[in-house]
């Protein structure tokens, strides 16, 4: 048992802050939220929930409490990032992130094991939803609709929560998303420039994609007079800074906000219940060590 005492609660449903309250948590579930008085007035101990033997309590007087944050696009990272999962998990937890959608990177078996340990409280970590990179683990490049459907079924059998796409031939994307939707799993797509000229956000949404990631694919769906963005002569897709640098210029090539085409795209995405996951982040991350 855990009791968080005297905190001011912001519960996330649009209601204003309220406190002081004592919040009782047992076995990963909030059992009760108990009003224990009024601001500036001494709290009567008789009005407070009692702590069970072996339980813990936190004095949160003067503090605010919110529900855990959900990070819809959080990479656990790998050797190239120089951090092990434990370090990443503790950073997330320290910043209030209690659920994370892990969109590809580590293999499905490793993510499933971390997810299991988190669920069983064997490690300090958020709840994990693992999305496998499309084609990850396949013996060869997926080149037919049948191979796409077979891989999707195998991914579901392996216990993944969904798929992270980067783009593929249109018929392969259609087949994979159709099969994935039949199985009831989630899907996300970073519409990489390598495929976006033939398959943008509108194509994905119509085919059943759950969410787009970053900005990729949306301005291309808003193009009116072109299919391919205006790449500078020295552009190199493998240089991520080129991609980021051209992103702002890309929007300037799209339909103007609230124009007919802009509104048509927006309204269709809303009608399809499509999710935009923009993953806002800082451009420079550094620490004074």
Which positions does each model-derived feature cover?
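Generic structural signal for hydrophobic
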Residues: 92, 154-155, 176, 180, ...
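Metal-associated gating/positioning segment near the N- to mid-region
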Residues: 48-50, 55, 63-122, 140-146, ...
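Divalent metal-binding pocket/active-site signature
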Residues: 144, 161-204, 213, 258-260, ...
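Active-site neighborhoods of metal-dependent hydrolases
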Residues: 138, 151-161, 218-289
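Histidine-rich, glycine-flanked metal-binding segment
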Residues: 9, 15-66
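Histidine-centered divalent metal-coordination motifs
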Residues: 6, 63, 69-77, 190, ...
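Divalent metal-dependent hydrolysis catalytic cores, especially in the metallo-beta-lactamase
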Residues: 88-109, 125-135, 156-168, 177, ...
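Active-site-adjacent beta->alpha loops and helix N-cap segments on the catalytic face
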Residues: 107-114, 167-181, 222-233
């Amino acid at each position: 048992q855990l009791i968080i005492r005297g905190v001011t609660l912001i519960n996330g449903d649009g209601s204003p802050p309220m406190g002081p309250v004592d919040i009782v948590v047992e076995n990963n579930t909030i059992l009760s939220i108990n009003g224990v008085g009024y601001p500036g007035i001494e709290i009567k101990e008789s009005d407070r929930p009692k702590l069970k033997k072996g339980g813990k309590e936190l004095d949160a007087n003067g503090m605010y409490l919110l529900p855990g944050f959900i990070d819809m696009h959080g990479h656990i990272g790998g050797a190239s990032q120089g951090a092990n999962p434990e370090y990443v998990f503790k950073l997330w937890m320290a910043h209030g992130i209690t659920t994370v959608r892990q969109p590809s990177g580590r293999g499905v078996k490793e993510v499933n094991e971390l997810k299991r340990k988190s669920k069983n409280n064997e490690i300090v970590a958020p709840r994990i939803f693992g999305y496998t990179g499309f084609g990850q683990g396949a013996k060869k490049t997926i080149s037919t609709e049948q191979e796409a459907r077979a891989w999707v079924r195998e991914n579901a059998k392996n216990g993944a929560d969904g798929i992270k796409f980067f783009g593929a031939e249109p018929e392969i994307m259609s087949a994979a998303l159709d099969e994935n939707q039949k199985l009831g799993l989630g899907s996300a797509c970073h519409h990489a420039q390598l495929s976006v000229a033939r398959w943008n956000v509108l194509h994905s949404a119509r085919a059943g994609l759950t969410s787009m990631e970053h900005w990729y694919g949306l301005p291309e769906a808003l193009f009116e007079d072109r299919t391919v963005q205006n790449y500078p002569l020295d552009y190199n897709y493998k240089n991520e800074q080129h991609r980021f640098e051209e992103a702002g210029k890309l929007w300037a090539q799209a339909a103007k906000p609230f124009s007919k085409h802009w509104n048509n795209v927006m309204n269709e995405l809303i009608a399809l219940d499509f999710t935009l996951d923009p993953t806002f982040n800082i451009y420079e991350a550094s620490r004074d060590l």
